[in-house]
């Protein structure tokens, strides 16, 4: 019997023949991270979904937040949040 071709690529199979393998491997990481559901920082449920570029919406508590283009949190946003939390703790003491 003849062998079938192996299906690879998944979400980025649309870029397969026109672009190189290194490019679609990078795009695969980006597209997987942008389409995953994230944990909502308000209600704690995994319902935060991408609506548009930089806009995420929680289907549980109906909050809409702005973030990074591909991920929910940017590294600079995480640093700012931790600095604000640290300053609030110092103020309370």
Swiss-Prot record:
What InterPro entries does the annotation carry? Ribosomal_eL37/eL43, Ribosomal_eL43, Ribosomal_zn-bd
Membrane-spanning parts:
none
Q: Looking at the Swiss-Prot or TrEMBL record, what is one Pfam family this protein matches?
A: Ribosomal_L37ae
User: In its keyword annotation, does this UniProt entry include Manganese?
Assistant: no
Report any one BP term from Gene Ontology: translation
Gene Ontology MF: a single term: zinc ion binding
Sorted UniProt keywords = Metal-binding, Ribonucleoprotein, Ribosomal protein, Zinc, Zinc-finger
The protein's superkingdom reads Eukaryota
What Gene3D superfamilies has UniProt attached to this entry? 2.20.25.30
User: Which chain segments does UniProt annotate as zinc-finger regions (C4-type)?
Assistant: 40-61
PANTHER family in alphabetical order: 60S RIBOSOMAL PROTEIN L43, RIBOSOMAL PROTEIN EL43-LIKE-RELATED
Q: Which family does it belong to?
A: Belongs to the eukaryotic ribosomal protein eL43 family.
- The name of this protein is Putative ribosomal protein eL43-like
């Amino acid at each position: 019997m003849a062998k079938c071709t192996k299906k690879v690529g998944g979400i980025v199979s649309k870029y397969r023949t026109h672009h190189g393998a290194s490019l679609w491997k990078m795009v695969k990481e980006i597209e997987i991270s942008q389409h995953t559901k994230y944990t909502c920082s308000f209600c704690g449920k995994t319902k935060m979904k991408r609506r548009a570029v930089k806009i995420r919406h929680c289907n549980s508590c109906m909050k809409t937040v702005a973030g990074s283009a591909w991920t929910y949190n940017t590294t600079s946003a995480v640093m700012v949040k931790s600095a604000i939390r640290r300053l609030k703790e110092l103020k309370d003491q």
